[in-house]
């Protein structure tokens, strides 16, 4: 059996190469083909190279962070299953899916044991965790631009990046409006501080976005917080951190299977830790199969 390993060697604390060596040592019967990303957004190029040789009897294993996986799945054919093991700094998809042991993933891959999950599909690509606008997108933007994340990852404190950038974003946020259509129902939401469309339970390095949000179900979970004075914004975020979602009057929640968003102007957003921008976007549920 051939196993194509697509790995991001720079994700998180740079452990991908070590895991590849462990796999080669533990599973000598497998023909391991290694493809390493060479820079930002190189996943599509590596997928294209893999697909030139890939057959239905082969397997794909992705090693990297949430962004590596979502960009790989954007290029990976829907009908082909995949396996995943986290080597990033946030690893929210792995936490939500309870992916912790590499040997369990490898056994599922070898035995062709797979499960159906749903990801979010959009013109900007596949989303495995959340699409965020407002506060959380600003946090990721600050973390990316500052270079602080790379420094802290080297000393295994990558998650601290988000806390420091969150404080900065709290003090310099921009409220926004959006027109929203959920399963054909349209409304305008004004003066937003935080807006997220979730496919999974966690985002932002382990913060629960919504308790029932799961990739195993065909559902989008929309979570948003309206703008308010600083003290109220802090309380709303604390409601998220301390899992008071249902009790909080500050956190709003809507579900659906198809969401269309229109913004008054081009706005920055983050998809699984990667930055983008748009003023119009449609998101739907897409079925995939994962070895687990």
Name the predicted role of every residue range:
Residues 9, 131-135, 198-201, 227:
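Glycine-rich beta-alpha junction loops
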Residues 43-44, 68-70, 136, 278:
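Short, well-ordered alpha-helical microsegments
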Residues 132, 196-210, 275:
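Glycine-rich phosphate/pyrophosphate-binding beta-alpha loops
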């Amino acid at each position: 059996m051939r196993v194509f390993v697509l790995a991001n060697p720079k994700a998180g604390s740079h452990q991908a190469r070590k895991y590849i060596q462990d796999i080669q040592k533990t599973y000598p019967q497998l023909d391991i083909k290694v493809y390493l990303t060479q820079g930002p957004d190189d996943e599509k190029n590596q997928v294209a190279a893999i697909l030139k040789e890939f057959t239905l009897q082969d397997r794909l294993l992705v090693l990297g962070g949430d962004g590596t996986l979502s960009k790989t799945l954007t290029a990976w054919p829907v009908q082909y299953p995949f396996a995943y093991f986290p080597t990033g700094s946030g690893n929210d998809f792995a936490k939500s899916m309870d992916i912790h042991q590499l040997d369990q993933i490898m056994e599922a891959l070898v035995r062709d044991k797979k499960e159906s999950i749903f990801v979010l599909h959009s013109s900007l690509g596949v989303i495995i965790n959340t699409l965020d606008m407002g506060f959380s997108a600003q946090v990721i933007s600050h973390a990316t631009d500052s270079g602080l994340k790379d420094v802290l990852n080297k000393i295994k404190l990558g998650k601290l990046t988000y806390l420091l950038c969150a404080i900065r974003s709290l003090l310099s946020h921009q409220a926004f409006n959006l027109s929203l259509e959920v399963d054909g129902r349209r409304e305008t939401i004004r003066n937003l501080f935080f807006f997220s469309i979730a496919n999974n339970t966690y985002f932002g390095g382990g913060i629960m976005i919504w308790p029932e949000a799961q990739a195993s179900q065909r559902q989008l979970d929309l979570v948003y917080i309206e703008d308010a004075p600083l003290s109220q914004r802090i309380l709303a975020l604390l409601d998220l951190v301390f899992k008071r979602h249902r009790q909080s009057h500050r956190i709003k929640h809507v579900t659906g299977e198809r969401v269309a968003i229109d913004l008054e102007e081009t706005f920055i957003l983050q998809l699984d830790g990667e930055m983008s921008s748009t003023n119009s976007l449609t998101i739907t549920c897409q079925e995939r199969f994962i070895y687990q």
